Amino acid sequence: MTSENPLDPNNAYAAADDAPLSEGDPTGAPADSGSDTLTAIQAARVAVKTLLDGGVRYVVVSPGSRSAPMAYALAEADAAGRVELLVRIDERSAGFTALGLALSTGAPVAVLTTSGTAVGNLLPAVMEANHAAVPLVVLSADRPDELRGTGANQTTDQLDLFGEHVRFAVDVPAGTNPQRAVETALSAATGVFEDTPPGPVQLNLAFRDPLVPPPADHLPEATGRRTWQIGRGPEPLTLAPAPATLAERRTVVLAGHDAGPVAEAFARAHGLPLLAEPSSNSRFGPNAVGPYRLLLEHFGPDSAQPIERVVLFGRPTLSRPVSALLARADVPSALYQPLPVAWYEPGRRTELPLDNLSDLADFSGRGSSGWLDAWLLAGAAAQHALDQALSEEPAATGPTVGALVWKHARGQLMLGSSNGIRDVDLAGQPAPEPHATIFANRGLAGIDGTISTATGIAWGGRQETTLLLGDVTFLHDAGGLLLGFAENDPLLRIVVLNDAGGAIFNLLEHGAVQESGTYGNAVERLFGTPHKVDISSLAAAYGVEHCAVSTTAELAKALAAPSSGRSIIEVRTDRAGLRKLHGRIKAAVGEAARSVLAG
């Protein structure tokens, strides 16, 4: 094979994006060279070109020797402007970064690792991608067949590593043409293959020495920097008003994770209250109710206006009152499901699955007289009572932080699992229009990889991005702050609610156990996981701007300040009184709701 200039017009990566493989073959091999004669570099170039032809525009790379052929081929494509590479030394962080890129772009994103434990570090991101239906393409480099099972260094069975968490996995033997395998993998990742939801796939690419390319004429460094903008949320939809022939019913619209603007449009068109989780991307508009989870009991079976039916969009994951409502045998519920989803198995849920809005409208009906007004009046009273209760707190609390971050978010907002997203769900007042695109890892709702996911979201969306998370979640992925000098800084503001431990357990049954005294110390140690980490020093070590605040006014000022790169706002709070605070909020909201509904 003769060496080729990656910027030569005949090179595949410099060709048009839609150029077929036969035009400007990137391998440099003769057309009749056969399927088992490719060098490692030739096979890697075929794989990369096929990925790009299939719509991959971002690849996250972790360094390694066995994966070097793919790294070199990707560097050539990067220099030609056909793909953007992002380098992360920690494979777990790389996996979640790729996940975030795929979330923000909606397109398949690849992550490249060398062999051995490097591949295993991708498992958490692959599991999340599976349950969240995210098109994540794992490119795992491997030893050739003759080295497997011999005790060769960094060699194990990689193909079965992810099990049922991948839509498709294939072993590509060394020296063979990977084009068909890559095409099939991309079809599976994007949901085209066998009519399944999108999700992760694995291409296990074996390479034989030599792993480096022949001398190239010239490989310039990529030029230009990304441009960033302050965006807004998804555009609202408009549906035709419900016809008068529809039956009147006391139906509520529940919008769970990833429901989308269609949930808001449906509620508005049919005169129904909208109970929307933050990551539904439908928590806006005139029908949205703020602290809805505290109001459900006031529309229960013994109330004057009990809920008769439920229409569900997306996946509900945040609150027990919602789960209890969906579990009620006396309240029929329907799930809008126009496409296959990854978060449940058919037949395992009680909701009636409907794939079109017309049938959904027949099920839901239109709001009964006074039904929507009752919810909106109760919601306004509840929001006022909640805001009043929070204003009486001398220092910032989780709900006040959630409300402020929600109010100030522009462009993209990611909410960490645990208390962060629940604080917003409780206290975040619905806006008239969508003001940001909301992301959250709700596939398996783990706290791992949150900073890395947000970094990928910021890179992919090319917008100002805010991340709200707790200190334990922050520390779990502190390595996600590490960026090399050659990587562009994303425009990412990280708000850390630091209460020196895991506050969510204070609000669960464990909080009551701790208050009882017998297991108090054990609960604090095992669930509270107290720490004394100096986040300012940690930020300095990674070269990230940091400021600390403790009051609502200080936080509002910090959120309003312009940002030019990555920054951390540390909100120092105390979780000791959190359980009692939530008790006061519930009591205040309950009193306000009862007063309004009593008329």
Curated annotation (Swiss-Prot):
Domain of life assignment: Bacteria
InterPro entries referenced in this protein's UniProt entry, alphabetically: MenaQ_synth_MenD, THDP-binding, Thiamin_PyroP_enz_TPP-bd_dom, TPP_enzyme_TPP-bd
Cofactor needs: Mg(2+); Mn(2+); thiamine diphosphate
Keyword Transmembrane helix: no
Cofactor-binding details, from the entry: Binds 1 thiamine pyrophosphate per subunit.
GO biological-process terms attached to the record: menaquinone biosynthetic process
Enzyme kind, highest EC tier: transferase
CDD domains per UniProt: TPP_PYR_MenD, TPP_SHCHC_synthase
Catalytic activity field: isochorismate + 2-oxoglutarate + H(+) = 5-enolpyruvoyl-6-hydroxy-2-succinyl-cyclohex-3-ene-1-carboxylate + CO2
Region listing for Disordered, in residue ranges: 1-35
SUPFAM superfamilies: Thiamin diphosphate-binding fold (THDP-binding)
Record pathway: Quinol/quinone metabolism; 1,4-dihydroxy-2-naphthoate biosynthesis; 1,4-dihydroxy-2-naphthoate from chorismate: step 2/7; Quinol/quinone metabolism; menaquinone biosynthesis
Nuclease keyword on record: no
GO-annotated molecular function: 2-succinyl-5-enolpyruvyl-6-hydroxy-3-cyclohexene-1-carboxylic-acid synthase activity; magnesium ion binding; manganese ion binding; thiamine pyrophosphate binding
Any one Pfam family match given in the protein's UniProt record, by short name: TPP_enzyme_N
Alphabetical list of HAMAP family matching this protein: MenD (MF_01659)
UniProt subunit comment: Homodimer.
Family from the record: Belongs to the TPP enzyme family. MenD subfamily.
Function comment: Catalyzes the thiamine diphosphate-dependent decarboxylation of 2-oxoglutarate and the subsequent addition of the resulting succinic semialdehyde-thiamine pyrophosphate anion to isochorismate to yield 2-succinyl-5-enolpyruvyl-6-hydroxy-3-cyclohexene-1-carboxylate (SEPHCHC).
Protein's name according to its UniProt entry: 2-succinyl-5-enolpyruvyl-6-hydroxy-3-cyclohexene-1-carboxylate synthase
Species this chain originates from: Arthrobacter sp. (strain FB24)
